[in-house]
Amino acid sequence: MPSLHASPLFDDFDLTLAPGHRAEALGPLFYEEQKETQQTWAIPPLLSHTLDPATDSEEFDFAYPLFTYDRYGEQYRWQIFQLLNHSGGPTQLETARDRFSLFPFYFQQRSSDPSQNYTAVLPFYGHLKNRFFRDEIFFVLFPVFGETRKKDVVTDNYLYPFFHLRHGEGLSGWQFWPVVGHERKEVTTQTNILDEVEVIGGHDSRFVLWPFYMQRISGLGTTNQVWQQASLPAYDLVRSPARDQTTILWPFFSRIDDREKKYREWELPWPFVVLARGEGKTTTRFFPLFSRAHNPTTQSDFYLWPVYKYNRFQSEPLDRQRTRILFFLYSDLIEKNTQNGTARRRTDFWPLFTHHREYNGQSRWQALALLEPFLPNHKSIERDYSPVWSIWRAESDPKTGAASQSLLWNLYRRDVTPASQKCSLLFGLFHYQSDTTGKRLRLFYIPVARSKAAPPKL
């Protein structure tokens, strides 16, 4: 099928890094792409739509992040600037569930299981389930009264956060913050998935005129009972079989003896001067001049923070290294698979370029890159905004031998495969193509040269 090359007015071409085809028009202002089973069309930076029948998924962005719509199977969610949102669809336990929120004033859920329905109008009256890190929340004229439940622990708040009563399995407590408070949990047991009985440690905590006197004993009934007492900022003491910590005039002086992780640490004051020595941790930090810290799996260094920062994490088969200069101005991330010797790498130099190479050797180079260094691998940014400022794009796939380069939204474009080569320049006024059938040259859209491929030798 013949292709039209008149970029940046219009161009269409095969994809380099995946099976598929792409058409672009009016420079960066419109494109349509078929990538394997995924179909995308967009009018950057205003809107984009992606549909994948193979996964039964759909995505739509309008002035991202102002409005987004996402669907996977029967589950869907749309939102307007994360303040107004609606989601729905079946779950593992419900044939249908719909949620609607106008944050932070109105929350609603309707479910095929009536026990999961709720409505909340803040601050007047409401009941929520599985929201805000709590199993249940009930309130009346919040902060006058609010009740929360997380597993078996129920907390009744009156004039939050000043007074509360708390109870649960083996647990009772109360507080009149910041004047006085006390809470105690007895040692309890539970049966795990292996039908084994596990001990859940208890605790006992109290405070008077917080934060001037606080004391807590945790891990009651276990082999690592922890005692802690503090009167901030005067002192903070922690004693346990695994770890001792002494802090005087926080944050000016702290000493840590961690017998479990096998290191000792001095902070004077934290976080500016930190010294740690031992098998489990070695740190020398004089912030912001320099810092070197490492343990058996992690390394973290900086010099003239935030001018230079280096981090490394090693856990077979992953070896991850990242070098940064001035936060996001320059970033170089390398992730190696130590078992098979493959690696991927991403380099960002804001706002000039971004380059990444995958484990399979595929690479992509883009200039400019205004948001990509801050939000790497972000689908909406790549769909909606990258085409607007990517004045240069280069892609290559060493396994297929395919490569492509594009300047100024295909004002110049070159595509190469092992069997063909195409080059187009200046709205298609110059166009050269060669393949197994021969070579062709057009100037000002007029064919001026054509040659047939030589027949194969017998």
Residue locations for each model-derived region?
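Outer-membrane beta-barrel proteins and related beta-barrel translocases across Gram-negative bacteria
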Residues: 1-458
